[in-house]
């Protein structure tokens, strides 16, 4: 992954903006994923609902966004930082890796709706970051 210093600055700026709102951003993104790609609900059979206001959606959305925020702190060593998570997804959870692509696109849309300063440069930086994150999470699939 080639992230310029400007890209890294944009990523860190967005991370700081959304950190206090991780639960709301995550819940919104996850609810969008369920609405646009209902087949993804099969990975969450214990959820009683799939809306942003439902407690399980809030909790899992926060978990995902907090993991993304943590990854943003490790831009220079993403493969090492994400190795355990990639192994868990690739060998234990067995989530179709294409869902990472779907969810990363939805995260971008969610950020664009939440952040008035989401510029084309911000979009480019976040897109590059999430593309690498998806690549790393998919790296342990056989």
UniProtKB/Swiss-Prot annotation:
Entry superkingdom: Eukaryota
Classification via Pfam families: Globin
Entry keyword Transport: yes
GO BP annotations listed: hydrogen peroxide catabolic process
Coiled-coil intervals: none
GO molecular function, one term: heme binding
Family to which this protein belongs: Belongs to the globin family.
Subunit structure: Heterotetramer of two alpha chains and two beta chains.
Function description: Involved in oxygen transport from gills to the various peripheral tissues.
Protein name as it appears in the record: Hemoglobin subunit alpha
Species for this entry: Bathyraja eatonii
């Amino acid at each position: 992954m080639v992230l310029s210093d400007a890209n890294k600055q944009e990523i860190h700026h967005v991370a700081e903006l959304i950190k206090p709102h991780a639960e709301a951003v995550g819940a919104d993104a996850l609810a969008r994923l369920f609405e646009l790609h209902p087949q993804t609900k099969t990975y969450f059979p214990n959820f009683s609902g799939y809306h942003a206001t439902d407690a399980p959606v809030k909790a899992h959305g926060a978990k995902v966004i907090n993991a993304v925020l943590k990854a943003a702190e490790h831009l220079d060593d993403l493969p090492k930082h994400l190795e355990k998570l990639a192994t868990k997804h690739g060998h234990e959870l067995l989530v179709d890796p294409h869902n990472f692509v779907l969810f990363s696109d939805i995260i971008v849309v969610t950020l664009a709706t939440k952040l008035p300063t989401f510029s084309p440069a911000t979009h480019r930086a976040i897109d590059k970051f999430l593309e690498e994150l998806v690549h790393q999470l998919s790296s342990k699939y056989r």
